[in-house]
């Protein structure tokens, strides 16, 4: 929730004549803004990437910094079309399993290591859960706040999961914090794009349906 408020506030400040669009109003409308904008537009915008990186750094506290997050977003922008082509192959059940193992700590039977792919999937699912629980049926006005929230949440949660796994001595060999964050935003992008093409009600219902598996 703190992250959603931060993004909403930063987005509100960036708009002219935004006096009536306070942080609470923007927060409630994040889902609507997400649906009314091309997610690629955020990645194409240096200003949006910078705001997203800064908000993610604030949300992650000592776990991450804006330079690292900005680098990850730049890489995602360069690879966004190839990542998008993989959207239909993304495994929701696998991501939910990783979420339960590394976030909820419920799945103790599996022996999956804390690799970039596993932690990234878990972080993306946590981001979707937080995004849906923090959004409502408010404003449907256009803007980049929604996209920034989804990508930023994935990055901040990825950085936290890596540090937690490292503290427990469970990080797989060769796994770095940046590689986890890269996987987290890639999973988030794939899930969003897949949700846009599944069902007749659009991306929001798709993300809500995905979150319903563990909410």
Where are the predicted features?
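Amphipathic alpha-helical interaction segments
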Residues: 1-215
